[in-house]
Swiss-Prot record:
GO molecular function: lyase activity
EC number: 4.2.1.-
Protein family membership: Belongs to the D-glutamate cyclase family.
Any Pfam family matching the protein: D-Glu_cyclase
Alphabetic keyword roster: Lyase
Class of the enzyme per the UniProt entry, highest EC level: lyase
Keyword Glycoprotein: no
Transmembrane portions of the chain: none
Name by which UniProt lists this protein: Putative hydro-lyase BPUM_0381
Alphabetized HAMAP family for the sequence: Hydro_lyase (MF_01830)
Gene3D superfamilies: PSTPO5379-like, PSTPO5379-like domain
Length: 263
């Protein structure tokens, strides 16, 4: 068992601020919702808000912060999004410039932060149903892939959907769809089951983000829309600056995962 599995979200965030947790967050603070990050300048914030509204599977919004305010008052009112992710990415004109563990030096008064639901949230529910989650079992980051599925454009924002993949035993696929469909605020049910080539993935063993998960005999690759989609969109849109989380390195909110369930 991961030693941080039973920690409270505030404890995890404190350890992240202290740089004692620096890796992927799958399995941490079990039972609490996790979130992806997208930060843009205020002048682009409405376009991105509209992008999320038009692409709810990939970008389900959990929280939108006021311009210049780094405190997610809805999802974790004592947190600071500048310090409470294990790792961030700085993009300039669509190019990844660097990865950092603190964005305080990059934060500006006209920046707007968006917290987007993460599928790590429903993994606890999968495991409660005895459905294996390979990347948690093996202690690595979830594999993520850029697809040939185009997101609906909103203002300047456009680009392909990114998906995460979990190998599911064939006899448990129906149950995995039922379980995850309860959580539309964190991507909901899968968007594709089976042949990766049908959604533009040439080699499932070579993810664009994260790390490879072994697909065992009798298992089927199942794909969910992913909150790394905004990073693919940033690469296409090329804003002057955008700040995101590093894939797999999420924000732990104070919201219980079951609070986001619809059934």
């Amino acid at each position: 068992m991961n030693i941080y599995q039973t920690y409270e979200p505030s404890q995890i965030r404190e350890l992240i601020r202290k740089k004692e947790i620096t890796g992927p967050t799958a399995g941490l603070a079990e039972g609490y919702a996790q979130a992806n990050l997208m930060i843009v300048k205020k002048e682009l914030a409405f376009d991105f808000l509209l992008f999320c509204q038009r692409n709810p599977a990939a970008c389900p919004l959990l929280d939108v912060l006021e311009p210049g305010d780094p405190v997610p008052r809805k999802s974790a009112p004592k947190a600071d999004i500048r310090t409470d992710f294990p790792k961030y990415r700085i993009y300039r004109k669509g190019i990844l410039q660097e990865e950092v563990s603190d964005i305080s030096a990059y934060w500006e008064d006209d920046m707007v932060a968006f917290l987007i639901g993460c599928s790590f949230t429903f993994e606890h529910a999968l495991m409660l149903n005895d459905i294996p989650v390979r990347h948690i079992e093996n202690g690595h980051n979830v594999p993520m892939y850029q697809t040939n599925i185009a997101c609906k454009r909103a203002g300047v924002f456009h680009g392909p959907m990114v998906v995460s993949m979990r190998p599911i035993p064939a006899h448990q696929i129906t149950r995995s769809v039922q379980v995850t469909s309860r959580f539309p605020s964190v991507h909901g049910g899968p968007i594709h089951i089976g042949d990766p080539a049908m959604i533009g993935i040439a080699n499932v063993d070579q993810p664009d983000f994260g790390e490879t998960s072994v697909i065992k005999e009798g298992e089927v690759p199942v794909f969910w829309a992913c909150g790394v989609t905004p990073q693919a969109v940033v690469m296409h849109t090329k804003p002057e600056i955008a700040i995101t989380h590093a894939p797999g390195h999420m924000f732990i909110t104070d919201q219980r995962d079951q609070q986001l369930g619809v059934l």
